[in-house]
Every structure is written in structure tokens, then in C-alpha cells.
């Protein structure tokens, strides 16, 4: 960078600093933020408090299962109530530890137990590696560290349905029977699930040891979402920077998707960020629509990024057909290119029937459109089109070493390999 470029960059930062500020505290709009009040969740707060109040009397509370779709306030409400419980218990000299575990990340029996042990490492000096020990040994350490003194331990397992679907229900069995093996401490579990049918995945022996109470969180409606956004906006934005239509529009768009407060907060935050980057003095409805487009684009990129390898190869076959002007294509045509690409990668191809299933999955995810059409006496077939531009898909695959080798080849290259 030469001196002129350095000066220009300095001036750019100065200019950006002097621009009218939009955000007073952007963190208020993050999912991780716990507000001082939770509008339209007072009933659920009271129910959780009633279930947990035995702690303050020295009694073990029931285990709790919290249900509701994404963005219905489950996690923030549980965090709010358990934080308040800790404050009150401190006043009464009752030791309470709350351990929050996100089971989308900590997704095995071993890792959940290790996380609980390591929560106490500053107190006990005991730390378990995240892999490598026998699970029974980790469980023994868990009992040892928890039972070092009298206390209540509340273990919050967020997205517990994902843990059970991936790794089974052994962790729940371990934690729900642990109280029979402890002498000083008492343990209670709060499971948070997006899946209302979650308990159908549990073994009868786990169900019998749970003795749980259930709290259901219904979706928010547009008016409730508006109240939530109004409350957060007061702390998040400087006065007068939001146009009157911004919050109602964010609320209405999020209400379409089962009343998702997370989506509403994301829309408001991203709209503010776009306005800030544009140097606008106000956040307008135009910025909300741009935010909606950006969030959908980011979500689609994330979906593509996390596809299994076989689905990525299949998707790239469809990209090549599109770039060659050969869409819509049928399943057989797509399968032919997919098989060539598998050979290029030295990858065992799946059967055409299995690829037909993967095409349906890509269709359900919204990445492609696979419409069944009638060909008269030739029967019915799928017409496959892309819903995402080849450029965007290539851009995601650029950073994926498993699929990268394919990016340099064209449709003709892939077909030539078999000649």
C-alpha cells in the first residue's frame, strides 16, 4: 500500500466515523442478549418459576421440557428465569449452578458430560479432554465434581432434540438417574426442543426416569413481535433514526414464518447495518426489504455449505447443465453428469434411485425446483431447474476442498473423461 492509498484509507475511516450514527447498542438485537423484560412471555416465566422454586426450599425441582418452534423465546426465557433464580438463591445462601449447553454444537453423550465436568474446573482442578476417555470414566468424574459440596445444579440442554436424534438418549438417562448416586448435590435438567414430538424418540426407561413437567411456547403474532421490536429498538437505536413503517414491516415479515422473533430481530439489525453502510440518516422500509433479501441469501449459502458431499456433487452437475444451457433437465440427464463427476473425484456414485431422493431433498431445501410433468404416452418425469444462480453456488464451493477440484472443469470436460 503506497502513501496515497494509506491517506485515502485514513480519510475513509474518518468519513465513516463522522457519518450519522444509527446504532446506540447493536448487541441488544443479538439472539444472545437477555433483556430485563420479556413481553408476552410472562405466563411461561411464571410457570418455570413455580417449577424451580423448590430449589429455594432446599428441595429438588422437577425436570422440565420446554417446547416451541424456533424464535418463540424458549432459550431467552429459560436464561432469564435461571439468572433470576441464581440472584435470589444467592440472597438465601443457597448455592445454585446453572450450566447451559447448546446441543447443536455439543452433540454427543461424551461431550455433554465433559462440558459439565469442565464447568467446575476452576473449583475442582479437574478437566476432561473433549475426546479420549471412556464415557464411564467421564461420568464418574462428573459425579465426583458435582458432589464435592451441597448445591443445586441445573443443566440446560438447548436443542436437545438434535442431540438425541444424532447420538441417542443415553445422556438423558445418565442425568436423570444421577440424583440416586449423589449424597450432597441435587441435579435438575431443563431440555429445550424445537420438536414437539421429541419424546417419541426416547426409550421407555428414560421416559420413566424423567418425571418432567412441560412448558409450551406458542408462536408470536405480528402485534407481539412489534412489541418485542419496539422494546429492543429503544435501546438499540438512536432516537428518530427508524421510519415509522420499519418495525411493523419487520414484525409482519417474521410473523409469516411462524412468528419467529429471531427473524424479526435479524431483519431490524441487518436493515440498520445496511442503512449505516449506505450513509443514510434513517432506516427505511427499503432497507428492511434489502435485509430480507440478504438474510435469505446468507441462509441459502449456509444450507449449500452444509450439504453432504454426494448432494454437492449432484448440485454441481445441475450447475454445469445450467451453464451449458441444458436446463430444465430430467433425472436421467442429471444422473449422467453426476456419475461423470463422481469418476473425476474417484467417488463411488449412488444409484439413480438414491439420486432421485437427493433431488427431492434439494427441491425441499429450495435450492432447485424439481417439477413432475407429464410426457403423455412417455409417462411422467421431473423437470429440474436451479433456484440459485450458478455464480452463488460456485462461490460457496470455492472454499470447500472436497468439491474444489470440480470447479475448473466444464460439462464437456466431464463427458470427455469417459470417451
Curated annotation (Swiss-Prot):
Pfam families membership: AAA_22, Cdc6_C, Cdc6_lid
Record GO biological process: DNA replication
Gene name in the database record: cdc6
InterPro entries to which the protein is assigned, alphabetical: AAA+_ATPase, AAA_22, Cdc6_C, Cdc6_lid, ORC1/CDC6, Orc1/Cdc6_arc, P-loop_NTPase, WH-like_DNA-bd_sf
Domain of life: Archaea
Keywords: ATP-binding, DNA replication, Nucleotide-binding
Family the UniProt entry places it in: Belongs to the CDC6/cdc18 family.
Residue sites binding ATP per the record: 72-76, 220, 232
Name this polypeptide is given: ORC1-type DNA replication protein
Keyword Nucleotide-binding: yes
Organism: Pyrococcus horikoshii (strain ATCC 700860 / DSM 12428 / JCM 9974 / NBRC 100139 / OT-3)
Single Gene Ontology MF annotation: ATP binding
Role: Involved in regulation of DNA replication.
Amino acid at each position: 500500500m503506497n502513501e496515497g492509498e494509506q491517506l485515502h484509507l485514513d480519510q475513509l475511516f474518518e468519513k465513516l466515523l463522522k457519518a450519522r450514527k444509527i446504532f446506540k447498542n447493536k448487541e441488544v438485537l443479538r439472539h444472545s442478549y437477555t433483556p430485563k423484560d420479556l413481553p408476552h412471555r410472562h405466563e411461561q416465566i411464571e410457570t418455570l418459576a413455580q417449577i424451580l422454586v423448590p430449589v429455594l426450599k432446599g428441595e429438588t425441582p422437577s425436570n422440565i421440557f420446554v417446547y416451541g418452534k424456533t424464535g418463540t423465546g424458549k432459550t431467552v426465557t429459560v436464561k432469564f428465569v435461571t439468572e433470576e433464580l441464581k440472584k435470589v438463591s444467592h440472597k438465601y445462601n443457597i448455592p445454585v449452578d446453572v450450566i447451559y449447553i447448546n446441543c447443536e454444537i455439543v452433540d454427543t453423550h461424551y461431550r455433554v458430560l465433559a462440558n459439565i465436568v469442565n464447568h467446575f474446573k476452576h473449583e475442582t482442578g479437574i478437566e476432561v479432554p473433549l475426546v479420549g476417555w471412556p464415557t464411564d470414566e467421564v461420568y464418574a468424574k462428573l459425579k465426583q465434581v458435582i458432589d464435592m459440596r451441597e448445591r443445586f445444579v441445573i443443566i440446560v440442554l438447548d436443542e436437545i432434540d438434535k442431540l438425541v436424534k444424532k447420538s441417542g438418549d443415553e445422556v438423558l438417562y445418565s442425568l436423570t438417574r444421577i440424583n440416586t448416586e449423589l449424597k450432597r448435590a441435587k441435579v435438575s435438567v431443563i431440555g429445550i426442543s424445537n420438536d414437539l414430538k421429541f419424546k417419541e424418540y426416547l426409550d421407555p426407561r428414560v421416559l420413566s426416569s424423567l418425571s418432567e413437567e412441560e412448558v409450551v411456547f406458542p408462536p408470536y403474532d405480528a402485534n407481539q413481535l412489534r412489541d418485542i421490536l419496539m422494546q429492543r429498538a429503544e435501546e438499540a437505536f438512536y432516537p428518530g433514526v427508524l421510519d415509522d413503517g420499519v418495525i411493523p414491516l419487520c414484525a409482519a415479515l417474521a410473523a409469516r414464518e411462524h412468528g419467529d422473533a429471531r427473524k424479526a430481530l435479524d431483519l431490524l439489525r441487518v436493515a440498520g447495518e445496511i442503512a449505516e453502510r449506505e450513509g443514510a440518516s434513517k432506516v427505511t422500509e427499503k432497507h428492511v426489504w434489502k435485509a430480507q433479501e440478504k438474510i435469505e441469501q446468507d441462509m441459502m449459502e449456509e444450507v449449500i455449505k452444509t450439504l453432504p458431499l454426494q448432494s454437492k456433487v449432484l448440485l454441481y452437475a445441475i450447475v454445469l447443465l445450467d451453464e451449458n444451457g441444458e436446463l430444465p433437465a430430467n433425472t436421467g440427464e442429471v444422473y449422467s453428469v453426476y456419475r461423470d463427476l463422481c469418476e473425476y473425484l474417484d467417488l463411488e456414485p449412488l444409484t439413480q434411485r438414491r439420486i432421485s431422493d437427493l433431488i427431492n431433498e434439494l427441491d425441499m431445501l429450495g435450492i432447485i425446483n424439481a417439477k413432475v410433468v407429464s410426457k403423455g404416452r412417455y409417462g411422467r418425469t421431473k423437470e429440474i431447474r436451479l433456484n440459485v444462480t450458478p455464480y452463488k453456488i460456485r462461490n460457496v464451493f470455492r472454499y470447500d476442498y472436497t468439491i474444489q477440484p470440480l470447479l475448473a472443469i466444464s460439462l464437456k470436460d466431464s463427458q470427455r473423461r469417459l470417451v
